[in-house]
């Protein structure tokens, strides 16, 4: 039994890949702004994948009627759809699944490490709490600081990446990502969820953010985002000393 799912016709690979060269240039260009941003380190990069690719990804983003969504409706977050990773993104278009894989790949990790200065970043192939998110009309996400640990892998949360897929998004619809200062006295940055915009944010227990006002987009539209979280491991005093390969003695 094959572990792969193949479509009919000639074998075809993904139609896009993230360029390590371009990503490094972007990281060097933006790392100063990332480190000095207020209220906490973050950066906004527009035109990340290019309009043609971004529009194509937006066109295959799962609609609100997709059976695999899990809907959240409570005080902190309402009319928000997510959790497609519970089914390993079954039924999600291959281009979006490939984007998620690219966000976990070497070129993107190198980009994040150069941009932020955080070394040894570890992606989450299970996309716990991340993956694809869709907020519908009337939905919101209250101000919050993100969870700080991956309990399953004993890792510390370091970065959040958000990539928006909302063509023709209008400011009157709301949905701006708000970044608030540590004592919650004021909003210091607002980031509209427009098409092809990448946001990278540092994690912190006082890094308050959300989109707390109810969305006023038309029925049939939603606030679509791709999210990925990144972690680091903590050194253990019980860890053995590092060594290279141990070669067995030659047998006579």
Where are these regions (language model features)?
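Fe(II)/2-oxoglutarate
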Residues: 1-38, 243-252
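Catalytic core of Fe(II)/2-oxoglutarate
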Residues: 2-7, 149-159, 167-252
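A structural signal for well-ordered alpha-helical scaffolds and beta->alpha junctions
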Residues: 23, 50, 54, 93-96, ...
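A structural signal for short, well-ordered beta-strand segments and their strand-loop junctions
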Residues: 44, 122-125, 131, 200-201, ...
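Non-heme Fe(II) oxygenase catalytic core, chiefly the N-lobe of the double-stranded beta-helix
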Residues: 59-62, 91-95, 100-156
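Proline-centered turn/helix-capping motifs that create local helix->coil transitions or kinks
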Residues: 65-67, 119-122, 167-171
């Amino acid at each position: 039994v094959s572990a792969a799912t193949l479509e009919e016709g000639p074998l075809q690979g993904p139609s896009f890949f993230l360029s390590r060269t371009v990503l490094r240039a972007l990281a060097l260009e933006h790392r100063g702004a990332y480190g000095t941003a207020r209220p906490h380190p973050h950066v906004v990069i527009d035109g990340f994948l290019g309009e043609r690719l971004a529009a194509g990804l937006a066109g295959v983003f799962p609609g609100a009627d997709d059976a695999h969504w899990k809907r959240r409706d409570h005080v902190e977050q309402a009319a928000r759809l997510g959790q497609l990773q519970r089914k390993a993104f079954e039924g999600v278009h291959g281009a979006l699944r490939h984007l998620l894989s690219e966000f976990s790949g070497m070129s993107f990790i190198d980009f994040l490490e150069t941009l932020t200065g955080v070394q040894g970043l570890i992606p989450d192939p299970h996309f716990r709490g991340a993956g694809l998110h869709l907020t519908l009309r009337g939905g919101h996400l209250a101000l919050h600081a993100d969870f700080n640990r991956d309990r399953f892998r004993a890792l510390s949360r370091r970065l959040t990446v958000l990539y928006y897929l909302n063509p023709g998004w209008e400011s009157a619809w709301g949905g701006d990502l708000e970044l608030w200062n540590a004592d919650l006295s004021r909003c210091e940055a607002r980031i509209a969820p427009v098409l092809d915009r990448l946001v990278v944010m540092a994690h912190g227990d006082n890094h308050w953010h959300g989109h707390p006002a109810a969305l006023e987009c038309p029925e049939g539209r939603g606030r679509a985002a791709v999210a990925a979280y990144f972690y680091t491991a903590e050194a253990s005093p019980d860890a053995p000393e590092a060594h290279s390969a141990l070669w067995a003695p030659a047998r006579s």
